[in-house]
Amino acid sequence: MKEKKILTTIIGIASILIIALIITTNEKDIKTIETNALALSNKKIGWGIKRNDNHEQPDLGSINLKLINEYNGIAMGNKEKKYVYLTFDQGYEAGYTEKILNTLKENNVKATFFITGHYLNTQGDLVKRMIEEGHIVGNHTVNHYSMPDINDEKIKEEVMKLQTAVYEKTGYEMKYIRPPKGEYSERTLALTNQLGYTTVMWSLAYDDWDEKKQGRTEYGKAKVLDNIHPGCVILLHSTSKDNAEILDEV
């Protein structure tokens, strides 16, 4: 699986060099798999990873990898390449995204921000800034429903309504999607693929989303630096004050 221009920076640990890398989207066109989504399994699968602390790629599970690869998704990059992908989920604004964008700009780093309909409607200026500064804006659906729980037409509405709204406000065409809550099924992967999207999961995350667990900057840094690996797709939440504080250091 060739890397695409999503999410990019290199974080310096061990032998990983501290450089920035941008990979253009035209290295690999998004491939659409022709299939009847209604005939596919709708068993809900929650994305999960088995961490290690030796900076090697984690175990994502055979089912996860099989389905993500089959529908041309992304979970990790090439383990031989010394870079990582940086992604943020943007369900709502807690006041830290501006600082995150400032840090990325100061370090000449590009990232991917997966936004919801609520985020677009309430933070249109920040979304425009993301695009203007060269970041990728991805689809996290209008209402953040678990997609296996809704029917085909509702999935299409959740995805395409946000896509249309982003285009009308910014002229930007979204190509990447992250399933809300990390929950998916073979049916939902097929549907979003048929809508022209590449699904992006992750290979490193921690409980940064919990508002009650902020004020743990050393914990956050350790969770990232102890588990990072070549080709890593990092999931962070911009609602975390800790992430805004530690981003410049990690």
Residue ranges and their predicted role:
Residues 1-2, 175:
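Short alpha-helical segments used as structural interaction elements across diverse proteins
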Residues 2-87, 93-102, 106:
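N-terminal pre-catalytic segment of deacetylase/amide-hydrolase enzymes
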Residues 9-14, 20, 223-226, 231-234, ...:
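Hydrophobic secondary-structure block in the mid-to-C-terminal portion of proteins
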Residues 72-79, 107-108, 121, 242-250:
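C-terminal domain-boundary segment and adjacent tail
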